[in-house]
Amino acid sequence: MAEIRKLKNYINGEWVESKTDQYEDVVNPATKEVLCQVPISTKEDIDYAAQTAAEAFKTWSKVAVPRRARILFNFQQLLSQHKEELAHLITIENGKNTKEALGEVGRGIENVEFAAGAPSLMMGDSLASIATDVEAANYRYPIGVVGGIAPFNFPMMVPCWMFPMAIALGNTFILKPSERTPLLTEKLVELFEKAGLPKGVFNVVYGAHDVVNGILEHPEIKAISFVGSKPVGEYVYKKGSENLKRVQSLTGAKNHTIVLNDANLEDTVTNIVGAAFGSAGERCMACAVVTVEEGIADEFMAKLQEKVADIKIGNGLDDGVFLGPVIREDNKKRTLSYIEKGLEEGARLVCDGRENVSDDGYFVGPTIFDNVTTEMTIWKDEIFAPVLSVIRVKNLKEAIEIANKSEFANGACLFTSNSNAIRYFRENIDAGMLGINLGVPAPMAFFPFSGWKSSFFGTLHANGKDSVDFYTRKKVVTARYPAPDFN
């Protein structure tokens, strides 16, 4: 039996062993094969990374912006050349099918492309005459060392909306990726090095609680970007803010999709199946609840069940597989417990994912509950799995009222051909990202990922102009130039 490789942290341009003696297995969720072991690093590791990044900031922040942008452009080119390899790593670590993994790689590359526009993004503004012989200019500067805490479900896309932009704008970065998906991170580091990355500018420390707390507490780290669950995100925001750091915390979701009587049912069902069960439901933009008007509900449910029956479940590397496993055994057990809870509380189970449970991997099949109410646990909680709740409503107003009761407000979608309904939905729904006749309203890199309510803690969102503001600070220079006498 081959020896299992133990991974190292990446600090100051080198792969270095952690100070820890604790390692966790990284497991392919479709096969339970142990891929490698990842260190559960210590605060001492974070301190080394932070000191290194702080030292590197002194020179990196002074590098000309076009030079920094060229390195990001080189990185984008290398990522594009290695798309298939990156997608393969996502599939074996995360469980997504190959098509989904390639899609994630594409979104990650888009984020790097956006960051490569740093010269224009860094530009400030000026006013030639604010008083007699007085002008003012507003300049952007990087803020220092930034910490990023990323989740398992998008191991490329989410880190790539963090560190490329922060680094392009002149900061240095410490990434704590998910301990479930380290091999993808290794490949990102390898390609970033080839792109011309200087030592100390980008650092990777694997770990769990100690690493998170080290990032939140270290005085050299000036800002923190987090993506993950609500309980952890709330903790990160509170503790980071207490330590006077700039924090953006993107957390949980319970996204609602509204289907009106005039919706194109074929397109609607196709979109909802993809949104609810793609990536095994493990994404913060997944469709978790459908509220459907009563006049079309029976037909909608029939078509939905018919579509779901065609879903192929299995290893994401296999041809034709749509639904892969959830990330680990704990997630599988948690999902099964929610199915039991839904039954206990009176929801009608019309597609039972327990029928697809297998000992070969962490599989749970597509699960659909009908006749769900807002008092039920399966409506309230973020399940983060291939479980969809359906609520029948009288009209759009009732559907919006139900969605607005949720503590989460990442995204919401509407399927209709009525322009008045679209406008009413846009103006009255409490959610930060809306989709009209599409299932996943995740924005492109140049728009903010703008969750509301308990889906986001902070002021400046990830992506778009918000990310530029988050990773920079401003300096306003006011200057008087006495009028010269050229006569």
Swiss-Prot record:
Example GO BP: valine catabolic process
Keyword Transmembrane found: no
Cross-referenced PANTHER family: MALONATE-SEMIALDEHYDE DEHYDROGENASE
Assembly with partners or alone: Homotetramer.
Matching InterPro entries: Ald_DH/histidinol_DH, Ald_DH_C, Ald_DH_CS_CYS, Ald_DH_N, Aldehyde_DH_dom, MeMal-semiAld_DH, MSDH_GmP_bac
KO phenotype (gene knockout): No effect on vanillin degradation.
The protein's name in its UniProt record: Malonate-semialdehyde dehydrogenase
Catalytic activity entry: 3-oxopropanoate + NAD(+) + CoA + H2O = hydrogencarbonate + acetyl-CoA + NADH + H(+); 2-methyl-3-oxopropanoate + NAD(+) + CoA + H2O = propanoyl-CoA + hydrogencarbonate + NADH + H(+)
Oxidoreductase found in the keyword field: yes
Keywords carried by this UniProt record: NAD, Oxidoreductase
Top enzyme category: oxidoreductase
Enzyme Commission designation: 1.2.1.27
Function, in words: Catalyzes the oxidation of malonate semialdehyde (MSA) and methylmalonate semialdehyde (MMSA) into acetyl-CoA and propanoyl-CoA, respectively. Is involved in a myo-inositol catabolic pathway. Bicarbonate, and not CO2, is the end-product of the enzymatic reaction.
Pathway(s) annotated for this protein in UniProt: Polyol metabolism; myo-inositol degradation into acetyl-CoA; acetyl-CoA from myo-inositol: step 7/7
Coiled-coil stretches noted in the UniProt entry, renumbered to this chain: none
Annotated PROSITE patterns: ALDEHYDE_DEHYDR_CYS
Phenotypic consequence of C413A: No effect at either the structural or enzymatic levels
Protein residues bound to NAD(+): A150, F152, K176, E179, R180, S229, T251, E382
Outcome after substituting R107L: At least 50-fold decrease of the second-order rate constant for the acylation step
A UniProt-annotated Pfam family: Aldedh
